């Protein structure tokens, strides 16, 4: 029996094992929860619905629409399982154009075609010192083609999901922070960078940004963060997608060195190209032209890249939908936004090849698959 359980609380509700025989227990459990001391003024909406039998298993204010928060990720991950399958792995493909001469010089460019793999260099799948290990595999693939030098550039193409940067409606106060990282056809390192601060021993004193990992060329931070007498991070980064001008406000603990604050990456597509160029240079394979993201080329009038006349170097598979969904559902908000929308974009691309639909259209198409569920999901995202 297929059962979809959707619950939206101001507090987290414990997972319930559902079967037809346990229906009364489910209703009793939600009634007990809703009547608990301290929840008298809480907004609680719950419904468990049996799609096969088209019957309500249990309900408490089931028709009341409230802000669903992190629970909406269940729609994306469930639809990904249903549509793509648990074993689906997004791919990042590497191509080259031009010819390789007798000296190993490629007279052409390397193209990286992103497939929206949210696991590429992700801290959820790799230890900190192994997050860039995939680049070594990519470099080895380039060398296997006999390429020793590139008379051209690295071009990353994240156009598979379009270039919205972030869905409409995302909070301005989120976008510059790590939990506000938007989806991209080229995702790398969770589209996140670590800012390393040192702080004074004095209260209400200035802080200093010492470095960042990975280093992002052109990143500029107006730092208005001061010290305070606490051990927690109360720093907030502000900045729009594709904008390298950021500013920071709030507080950090006093008398610290190398205090890390996580922030979003302005342009993941370009960062991936730059990271690959560095990895090649570390193996003495140099390019003659600086790396570029395809978005900037589009702004200059470039046409979509035709891969039919290019030669494939490597097709790199990311983690499976099952693996990605596990971490998405089990972790808090920090992982929800980027991966949930990345899954939605992957879904819409699989349904409509070549589509450049916005996130709002992806969500509307997801609603169609859940019309039998007695919920209003118009407010998702």
At which residue positions do the language-model features occur?
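Bacterial Sec-dependent N-terminal signal peptides
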Residues: 1-24
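Beta-lactamase-like hydrolase cores
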Residues: 20-52, 56-64, 138-146
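Extracytoplasmic
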Residues: 41-43, 61, 69-72, 89-91, ...
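Soluble periplasmic/extracytoplasmic beta-strand elements of cell-envelope proteins
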Residues: 45-49, 57-59, 93-95, 109-115, ...
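Active-site SXXK
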Residues: 54, 68-86, 154, 186, ...
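Short, well-structured active-site flanking segments
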Residues: 83-97, 289-291
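Polar, glycine-rich mid-to-C-terminal structural blocks
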Residues: 107-231
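A small/polar active-site loop signature that marks catalytic segments
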Residues: 226-381
């Amino acid at each position: 029996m297929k059962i979809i359980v959707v619950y939206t609380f101001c507090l987290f509700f414990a997972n319930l094992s559902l079967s037809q025989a346990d229906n009364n227990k489910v209703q009793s459990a939600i009634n007990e929860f809703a009547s608990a001391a301290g929840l008298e003024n809480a907004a609680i909406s719950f419904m468990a619905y049996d799609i096969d039998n088209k019957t309500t298993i249990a309900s408490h204010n089931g028709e009341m629409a409230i802000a669903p928060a992190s629970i909406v990720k269940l729609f994306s991950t469930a639809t990904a399982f249903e549509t793509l399958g648990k074993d689906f792995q997004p791919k990042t493909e590497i191509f080259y154009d031009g010819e390789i001469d007798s000296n190993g010089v490629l007279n052409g460019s390397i193209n990286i075609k992103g497939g929206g793999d949210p696991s590429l260099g992700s801290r959820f799948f790799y230890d900190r010192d192994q997050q860039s290990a995939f680049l070594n595999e990519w470099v080895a693939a380039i060398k296997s083609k006999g390429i020793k030098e590139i008379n051209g550039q690295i071009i990353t193409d994240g156009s598979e999901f379009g270039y919205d940067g972030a869905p409409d409606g995302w909070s301005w106060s989120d976008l510059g922070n790590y939990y506000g990282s938007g989806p991209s056809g080229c995702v790398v390192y969770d589209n996140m960078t670590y800012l390393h601060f040192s702080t004074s021993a004095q209260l209400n004193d200035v802080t200093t940004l010492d470095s960042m990992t990975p280093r992002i060329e052109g990143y500029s931070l107006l730092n208005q963060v001061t010290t305070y007498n606490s051990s927690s991070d109360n720093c907030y980064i502000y900045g729009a997608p594709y904008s390298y001008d950021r500013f920071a406000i709030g507080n950090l603990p006093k008398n610290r060195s190398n205090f890390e604050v996580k922030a979003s990456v302005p342009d993941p597509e370009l960062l991936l190209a730059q990271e690959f160029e560095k990895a090649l240079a570390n193996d003495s394979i140099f390019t003659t032209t600086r790396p570029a993201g395809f978005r900037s080329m589009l702004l200059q009038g470039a046409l979509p890249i035709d891969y039919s006349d290019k030669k494939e170097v490597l097709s790199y598979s990311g983690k499976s939908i099952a693996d990605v969904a596990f971490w998405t559902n089990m972790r808090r908000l920090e992982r929800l936004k980027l991966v949930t929308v990345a899954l939605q974009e992957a879904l819409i691309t699989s349904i409509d090849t070549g589509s450049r639909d916005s996130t709002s259209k992806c969500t509307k198409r997801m609603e169609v698959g859940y019309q039998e569920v007695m919920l209003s999901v118009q407010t998702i995202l």
